[in-house]
Amino acid sequence: ITATGSAGGNIVNVTINGKFEITNVKLDPICVDPRDVQMLQDLIIAAHHDAMSKIQDELKTKYGSMLGGMGIPNL
């Protein structure tokens, strides 16, 4: 399972796998401003959160009924 999350109108993309490990980061050069590093950091975090949400939704869809009664958080 993999999912790609985006932020900033798709200028930052983060891909993660089913273990929530980041496997790829794509940055549009427009978002790389040495005077505003904080914005880039925030966009990367937002894209990662978006990807995690997509993975969690996919896991719920595929395994939610099977694991629902086990009390696993966020599932």
What are these regions (language model features)?
Residues T4-K26:
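N-terminal intrinsically disordered, cationic/polar leader segments
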Residues I16-F20, C31, E58, K62:
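Amphipathic, positively biased hydrophobic alpha-helical segments used for protein targeting
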Residues L43, A47-I55:
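Stable alpha-helical structural segments in soluble proteins, enriched in small hydrophobic residues
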